[in-house]
Swiss-Prot record:
Name of the gene: rimP
Localization annotation: Cytoplasm
Family indicated by similarity: Belongs to the RimP family.
HAMAP family: RimP
One of the Pfam families matching this protein, by short name: DUF150_C
Role this protein plays: Required for maturation of 30S ribosomal subunits.
Gene Ontology biological process: ribosomal small subunit assembly; translation
Principal cellular location given in the protein's record: cytoplasm
Top-level taxon: Bacteria
Keywords: Cytoplasm, Ribosome biogenesis
Protein name as annotated: Ribosome maturation factor RimP
InterPro entries per the UniProt record, alphabetical: Ribosome_maturation_RimP, RimP_C, RimP_C_sf, RimP_N, RimP_N_sf
GO cellular component: cytosol
Length: 153
């Protein structure tokens, strides 16, 4: 099974568990770091994700994973909040953070810059518009490697 199919299958099975514990399933990733594999589950809610909430989700998801055993190789399960400087993966995430400052990392430079920072004004399936100082800058989505919320306290 491809990594993409694995993640999609896990989302379908994990999301009801996370929602049953009053959290939103923000993102799932399965990554190799050094010699170790990690299944990372990011959860969120209106009030954020507490340590106790992460522990509850971890226990519930761990039970499911033990039952369905979807990953043949050994791995560590990590459940956490996406953090203040979270990556914005979906249109739902972008919609939630309109009006906030974001950072766009690009695959290749536009006007000699590979990184743009500004207020998220709007987006569609093809581009993201941000306000940089007093100018609106439009960046094609296929040029964007990563979109991150600029963590501000």
């Amino acid at each position: 099974m491809s990594k993409h199919n694995l993640i999609e299958n896990l989302k379908k099975q994990i999301e009801p568990i996370v929602e049953g514990l009053n959290y939103e399933l923000y993102h799932i990733e399965f990554v190799k770091e050094g010699k170790e594999n990690y299944l990372r589950i990011y959860i969120d809610s209106e009030n954020g994700a507490s340590l106790e909430g992460c522990e509850k989700v971890s226990r519930a998801v761990s039970e499911l994973l033990d039952d369905i055993d979807p990953i043949q190789e050994s791995y560590y399960l990590e459940v956490s909040s996406p953090g203040i400087d979270r990556v914005l993966y979906t249109d739902k995430h972008l919609e939630k953070y309109k009006g906030y400052n974001i950072i766009l990392n690009l695959y290749s430079p536009i006007d000699k810059k590979k990184k743009y920072e500004g207020e998220l004004i709007d987006f569609n399936e093809n581009e993201i518009n941000i306000k940089v100082e007093e100018n609106i800058v439009t960046i094609p989505r296929e040029k964007i490697s990563k979109t991150t919320l600029k963590g501000e306290l």
